[in-house]
């Protein structure tokens, strides 16, 4: 049964033209309609007074939200990383075929966690069924309107269909201009669609999740965050229904997956470094990154000063809070070990995010086409270089962005990842 025909909440929904959207105040008296516009960039981040839920329908304060808008960006030519790719093999990999970077060993892998504990996981061949959930929210006619998020998911759907063998009937696209009420990205619809994505998942399936929209942070309540903050994403009705926190997304989309099932996630939003709560993050050198709280605190001091100097008082306050959190946590490596114990998955889950947890992500325009910076860079790299390793993918994305943006895209995984493996979707 498809997502759009699945009566999650029972009953029939009214036709789209009788559906009343959340009561947002339009800018300058403008009226909403159901067509895709050339959108104007937001003038300010979402207000810090909007409600946030903790996953149990309890509202909690939210903090550190934002999404930077840039009016224009020049198209950057992608140059491959220096040095040759890893030795290639003769194996075929289904759809598409790879003859470059090495293919994964699909036998059960083991990982011994420092401090005790043995965990097992399995790479996916990605030769089973394919499903995709793509969510793009422009927050039409609000103070925080974005330009490129709807374009991002439409472009991503074409990339997945044309290059990676996904089918339209196995894909759900949610935007604020959708004609189907089930495809409006409200909080409940988004959670239902996430459950649809992972329903009946089997080993070697290939699932894809893409979110382009506002992101933020809020206080961590369960002790699994090194920096003391959960990452969040903003549904269209977040003012009334609340945000969606990383713990919820992990519980819904990662935890139910069997060993050997692939979920690839791409978060083009602010503060998205840990948006899926995956415990292993890798550098462009291909090595596992450990948190350096002293360095992070130093950067927060710098960011606090720059925010204050530029008039961003809330940004300065939030960076000072980050400094205090790092100090009071005693540079908390215990949180990292706890996270790896409780967030480890036998499935094959990989997440690309637009920036680090403490950074904002750009909403921009390339040659007059509104887009998110990460979504654009991802499309550029995989289109021009179809046979990539994960290391080459991460380096390529950073290279595309490096001359224009300060944000540092992140690659995280639910288990230790060989970064020289072929990138497959």
From Swiss-Prot:
Positions of the catalytic residues: 214, 270
Chief localisation class: cytoplasm
Keywords: Apoptosis, Cytoplasm, Hydrolase, Nucleus, Protease, Thiol protease, Zymogen
Ranges of biased composition (kind: Low complexity): 13-28
Task of the protein: Involved in cell death (apoptosis).
Family recorded in the similarity comment: Belongs to the peptidase C14B family.
Protein name, per record: Metacaspase-1
Organism in which the protein naturally occurs: Schizosaccharomyces pombe (strain 972 / ATCC 24843) (Fission yeast)
Lineage: Eukaryota, Fungi, Dikarya, Ascomycota, Taphrinomycotina
